[in-house]
Amino acid sequence: MPASQRLRLICGVDEAGRGPLCGPVVAAAVILDPARPIDGLADSKKLTERARDRLAPLIRERALAWAVAEASVEEIDRLNILHATMLAMQRAVSALSVLPGEVLIDGNRCPTLAVPARAVVGGDASEPAISAASILAKTVRDAGMKALHEQYPHYGLADHKGYPTAGHLAALRRHGIADFYRRSFGPVRELLQNPPLWVEEESA
């Protein structure tokens, strides 16, 4: 691809899974094709699950390039969630089949990249490429949580997707900490250091 054409390519990057207590943090990078617009792109958190699931395959089909990457639970615990998120973003951009001229990152921090990058606060709502990346990252991570739910239904991961809801914390006290939990996160660390002396009875 000619350098002049590459310089016009904008890549959007976003993540999913910084706040949950378990599972990897997932990042996606998307270069949209101006000739193949996608209606309905928006911040993934503002869309219904049904809308995200409808848009994700369209993004994969119509984008000039896209990639999804992750940082593992072990990397999150070793590096901290911020640095692990930056690592996942680096991996996603590096995995693109097309090199962009500029990368737009949702938020206020940019990972170190081989191409110019700019942080855009609220970019998942204002920049279509970031919106597309947020949808891919969210749908991939949610699918991972649903797969874990099939193996470990007692945690309720299909419902809360790993976020620290009251029901999730109660399930952790009842069933203990599985190996896919982030031990560096406060609620998990607290339970490991101070296991409950008793557990609540499950409601009928």
Curated annotation (Swiss-Prot):
Gene: rnhB
Every RNase H type-2 domain range: 8-197
Role, per record: Endonuclease that specifically degrades the RNA of RNA-DNA hybrids.
Stretches of the chain forming a coiled coil according to its record: none
Binding residues annotated for a divalent metal cation, in chain numbering: D14, E15, D106
GO molecular function, one term: RNA binding
Family affiliation: Belongs to the RNase HII family.
Cofactor list: Mn(2+); Mg(2+)
EC number(s) per entry: 3.1.26.4
EC supergroup of this enzyme: hydrolase
Catalysis performed (reactions): Endonucleolytic cleavage to 5'-phosphomonoester
Protein name: Ribonuclease HII
CDD domains named in the record: RNase_HII_bacteria_HII_like
Source organism (scientific name): Azoarcus sp. (strain BH72)
Binding note for cofactor: Manganese or magnesium. Binds 1 divalent metal ion per monomer in the absence of substrate. May bind a second metal ion after substrate binding.
GO CC aspect terms: cytoplasm; ribonuclease H2 complex
InterPro entries: RNase_HII, RNase_HII/HIII, RNase_HII/HIII_dom, RNaseH-like_sf, RNaseH_sf
